[in-house]
UniProtKB/Swiss-Prot annotation:
The gene is aroE. Its EC number is 1.1.1.25. HAMAP family: Shikimate_DH_AroE (MF_00222). NADP(+) binds at G121, A122, G123, G124, S125, L208, G230. It comes from Helicobacter hepaticus (strain ATCC 51449 / 3B1). The active site is at K64. This is Shikimate dehydrogenase (NADP(+)). Pathway: Metabolic intermediate biosynthesis; chorismate biosynthesis; chorismate from D-erythrose 4-phosphate and phosphoenolpyruvate: step 4/7.
Length: 268
């Protein structure tokens, strides 16, 4: 048995991760099982993981920073991001954290030839997106509804503003919503007039929310921006996580990321 896996979040009923991972297990002939777990408090994340006997997990909103703080070791880009979306249990109780959101996002936009970017939000997903853009030398600005969480980005050298104080002084090639606005409501991630001004001179709009046309994307479409939801990013990060879940017990030569992603794309 490869093991039991799950995705943690709140809310979590919308998550398609179980479909993706269980389908990939089936296609590859692996005896793994993946489910969803609703968690009320992030402080209980590690305890819940261990008590459920999981071998690995994905972590989504709003627990990615908690996941970073509660694992025993952090590897790869997650060390700079300060947020983990993937946990893998090594040995008996050694919990290793990774971030596959960053590369999963970049795979979606690497062909866009972006000169600069604006990120809306300042949570764990924003950290992943911002840091991968910075690693590719793409100037990036962040805006958030409050000053909370912006200090991380300021220390990393990003230009940051509170929404109410932000006045665009240039156009941005891509607008990226990393907030939960539009997931279970009809809210925009920032003021409508502000967003209209940004869309009027933008090229691309990307919403990390997947499976629906959010108010953010609907507004961007009305300005004829090229729009993408988070489906491709979901598949990319899931395939990267899947490889991490399996690599200790499965022949890595058969775990090409693109092959896993193609399986997952069949089911979503």
């Amino acid at each position: 048995m490869l093991g039991f896996f799950a995705v943690y979040g709140n809310p979590i009923t919308h998550s398609k991760s179980p479909f993706l991972h269980n389908y990939a297990f089936t296609k590859l002939g692996l005896s793994g099982y993946y489910s969803r777990i609703l968690l009320d408090k992030g402080a209980n994340l590690r305890q819940n993981f261990l008590s459920n006997g999981l071998s690995g997990a994905n972590i989504t909103l709003p627990f990615k920073e908690e996941a970073f703080n509660q694992c025993d070791e952090v590897r790869g880009v997650a060390q700079n991001i300060g947020a983990c979306n993937t946990w893998v249990l090594e040995d008996k109780n050694h919990l290793v954290g990774y971030n596959t959101d960053a590369q999963g996002f970049y795979e979606c936009i690497k062909e866009y030839k972006i000169k600069n970017a604006l990120i809306i939000g300042a949570g764990g997903s924003a950290k992943a997106v911002a840091m991968i853009l910075q690693s590719h030398n793409i100037p990036t600005t962040l805006i958030n509804r409050s000053v909370q969480n912006l200090s991380f980005f300021v220390h990393k050298g990003f230009e940051c503003y509170v929404n109410s104080e932000f006045k665009p002084t240039c156009s941005y090639d891509i607008l990226i919503n990393t907030t939960s606005a539009g997931l279970n409501d009809n809210l925009l991630p920032c003021d409508e007039s502000q967003l209209k001004e940004l869309c009027s001179c933008g090229k691309y709009a990307f919403d990390l929310i997947y499976g629906k046309c959010t108010p953010f994307l609907a507004l961007a479409q009305s300005f004829h921006l090229s729009c993408s939801d988070g489906k491709e990013m979901l598949i990319n990060q899931a395939a990267l996580s899947f490889e991490l879940f399996c690599k200790q017990k499965y022949n890595k030569g058969n775990l090409e990321i693109q092959r896993i992603a193609s399986f997952m794309n069949e089911i979503l």
